[in-house]
Structure formats: structure tokens, C-alpha cells
Regions:
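Peripheral (often C-terminal) accessory segments that flank ATP-dependent C-N-forming ligase machineries
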Residues: 2, 285-349
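Active-site nucleotide/adenylate-binding loops and adjacent lid/helix of ATP-dependent enzymes
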Residues: 98-183, 187-233
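Protein kinase-like catalytic core scaffold
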Residues: 195, 243, 255-259
Length: 349
């Protein structure tokens, strides 16, 4: 085994897949999760369960690892900062703090001349009425919320849901005429040192990623712009590791940055089978200071997210040589819960 032991905060499927990639590189992992039933415990030799602010567990975690990363962005900044004072946390905690808030994230993008949909900070119901130029639009909590949680469609300023809790801050984003969604995954190893995956075309159902494919059916102009913006973002953040930028394309072929995920990303699961180096392996290589390997696409690919009961048929299915199924080994099947993914690879024409 390597002399490096990687600490991973978070025990979901991304933690599992990071641990699998680390093992491939002979790197031990220690997964720290606040859920004792986290599926990632099945993919590591060392699993710590408890509250992230538990001093005893933090001390145990730090004693076992050389470097720390995380599989989701909603970890309190103060915890990442505290860990980083003793062992390096990558990506840097300050990046996570910036991106945890949708308003500061959008401001960062706009300050770097990266187009987003029009938006405004919303603190109360009157702010929505004042910003009626953003209606119809989508109201999102500034912090927390993923896969459509904490979001409300606003079609008229008179029709504001009573479910909206105005003790929280929100961001109101104007709807565009959406044609397509894509994502770009990039791994930054240091100043101007990158591995970039080609844009991935995505389809969402109920605001949860359902389907991804490469190559994306997009123009060369959009492809280059999306890749350039992802590079600017990674460089401006002084990022280390794998990052994903999600984009919208409207019916006039305008590109908009939707959000930044400071971690490996669901749409990149297909890279496990389509490329010589997956997004997970590249992340491990970057945060652990390993050699950068030129990343090449070997196959075109399609990936299906298995949500809820979708998993049942796949657990008993026989697969062809070009089909790959990954079961996240979650004990409970729930509606809208990501249970696994299925990838088909195809040779380029």
C-alpha cells in the first residue's frame, strides 16, 4: 500500500466511488460519516461514524489520515477549517464556503465574466414583488438544498407559496427557454495543470439527474465556451481536485453557468468506463499529490441513474460485455433516492 491515507468526509455513493478509486491506487481510505448506515462503509476498511463536530471523533479521524477531501459540499465551514489547521483539506475550505451559498456563487461567476441567468437576493415576500422582472422564475434557498429540495416555482408575484420560510435567504432566478443541460468535469492539479473531460449531456427528471451521455450533441462553440469557463473557474478558485460546472443552453444557443459542484459529480460516473482515468481517480491523484496521467476517452458512453425502485430489476439482470452496473448498496429503497447507476459503452463511429 501507499504511504498516503486519504480521509473522506461523507459516506454516500460519491464517497464509495472515491474509496474504490483510491484502493485501485493502493491508497487506504478512512471515511467519516454522520450516518452509521452510510453505504460507503462497505467500500473502506476504516469507517468512523458520528457527528462531524464530535471532538473525540475528529481527533481519531485526524490521527489516521494524511490528507482530507469530501464528497458533498454542505459540510459546515468551521469544521473543514478546523481540520485544515492540522491536516490539509482539499479542495480548500474557503472554496466550499463560497459555493455553499448560491448568491455568492453567482456573484463569483459574474465577476469572472461567466454568464448566469438573471438573479436577485430575496429576503422577504416584498423582495419577490420588487423583482417581478425575474418572474416566472425559480426561488432557491441560498444554502443547503440539492436535487430540487428547497426550490419553489414562482409563476406570478401574487402566487407565492405559503410553504416558503422567509427566515431563510433565497435567490430568485429568472427562467430561460431551456434547450439542453450539459456539464463539464475538470481536475486541476495546480497552476495551469488540468485534465478536462469533454462536455456531458444530461437529462433531469423531477430535478434529479436521470441520464447522461458523451458525446454531447452540442456545437463546437458551446463545447469550447463551456470548457473555457470551467478552466477559468478552477484557476480563479486555485482549485485542487475534481470539479464540475453545470450549464444550461437556451433555445438561442446561449450558454449559462448554473452551478459549481466542488467535488466529483453524478454526471461523471460514466468516466469510470469511458476513459482510461475516471473523474474519481483524477481527484485522488490531485489531492494526494500523485502524478498527473493524460486522460483519454476510450469509448462513448451512456449512463442511467437508478432511482428508487429502478434498482430492483438491475439487481437480478444479466449484463452484456459493454454494460456496467454499480449498486450503491443502500439498505433502504426510497422514492427519489439514488440507488445505483448503469453505464453502456460504445466504440466511436
Amino acid at each position: 500500500m501507499s504511504d498516503i491515507t486519504l480521509g473522506i468526509i461523507g459516506g454516500g455513493q460519491l464517497g464509495s466511488l472515491l474509496s474504490v478509486a483510491a484502493n485501485k491506487l493502493n491508497i487506504d481510505t478512512v471515511i467519516f460519516s454522520d450516518d452509521k448506515n452510510s453505504p460507503a462503509k462497505n467500500f473502506t476498511k476504516h469507517f468512523i461514524s458520528g457527528n462531524y463536530d464530535d471532538e473525540k471523533l475528529i481527533k481519531e479521524f485526524l490521527s489516521k489520515v494524511n490528507v482530507i477531501t469530501y464528497e458533498f459540499e454542505n459540510i459546515p465551514y468551521k469544521i473543514l477549517k478546523k481540520l485544515n489547521e492540522i491536516k490539509p483539506v482539499l479542495p480548500k475550505p474557503e472554496i466550499n464556503k463560497l459555493i455553499q451559498n448560491r448568491y455568492t456563487e453567482k456573484d463569483f461567476l459574474n465577476k469572472n465574466n461567466i454568464r448566469t441567468t438573471r438573479y436577485s437576493l430575496i429576503k422577504d415576500e416584498d423582495d419577490i414583488k420588487i423583482n417581478d422582472g425575474l418572474i416566472p422564475g425559480l426561488l432557491k434557498t441560498c444554502t443547503l438544498g440539492y436535487d430540487g429540495k428547497g426550490q419553489f416555482k414562482i409563476d406570478k408575484k401574487e402566487n407565492i407559496s405559503s410553504e416558503i420560510d422567509f427566515t431563510k435567504e433565497y435567490i430568485l432566478e429568472k427562467f430561460i427557454k431551456l434547450k439542453k443541460e450539459i456539464s463539464v468535469i475538470i481536475t486541476r492539479f495546480g497552476h495551469q495543470r488540468y485534465e478536462i473531460y469533454e462536455p456531458i449531456e444530461n437529462l433531469h427528471e423531477d430535478q434529479i439527474l436521470k441520464y447522461s451521455k458523451i458525446p454531447a450533441q452540442i456545437s463546437e462553440k458551446i463545447k469550447n465556451q463551456a470548457t473555457d469557463w470551467a478552466t477559468i473557474i478552477a484557476e480563479e478558485l486555485d482549485y485542487v481536485g475534481t470539479l464540475c460546472v453545470e450549464y444550461f443552453i437556451d433555445n438561442k444557443e446561449n450558454l449559462y453557468a448554473n452551478e459549481i459542484a466542488p467535488r466529483v459529480h453524478n454526471s461523471g460516473h460514466l468516466t469510470i468506463n469511458s476513459h482510461n482515468v475516471s473523474q474519481f481517480e483524477n481527484h485522488i491523484r490531485a489531492v494526494c499529490g500523485l502524478e498527473k496521467v493524460e486522460t483519454k476517452k476510450i469509448y462513448n458512453a451512456r449512463m442511467l441513474n437508478l432511482i428508487g425502485n429502478d434498482i430492483k430489476d438491475f439487481r437480478v439482470k444479466n449484463f452484456k460485455d459493454n454494460e456496467f452496473f454499480f449498486d450503491y448498496q443502500k439498505t433502504e429503497i426510497r422514492e427519489k433516492r439514488k440507488m445505483g447507476h448503469f453505464t453502456i459503452i460504445e466504440k466511436e463511429n
